[in-house]
């Protein structure tokens, strides 16, 4: 068992869970993702089927920004994995998708205007997920 700090409960330490816990730690510690804006095992409905996104990262206004799909290290990241996360994105319409098996990581940025996506060379910092908007306090 391992304590999932986001779900605040102990969960079975499966190979996939090991990948999730390390990846979440990386996002929070090295990429500046706020722990309070990440949800693990988020339930969604795709068509008539209930599914669970492994992790969803939210913006400060509670809008979903990123879906992360984890696989155990011995599972290859095949087209089937990308198809799975794409189905989840049909519901959430995020700009960022990540698939990881702990050994390989792929980050994609959606390009909805051109109905395609781009593989990114690195996983973005949290501040790179959305254009920053600065508010001048005199305009409020």
Predicted regions mapped to residue ranges:
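A short, conserved, highly charged catalytic patch centered on acidic carboxylates
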Residues: 1-96, 103-140
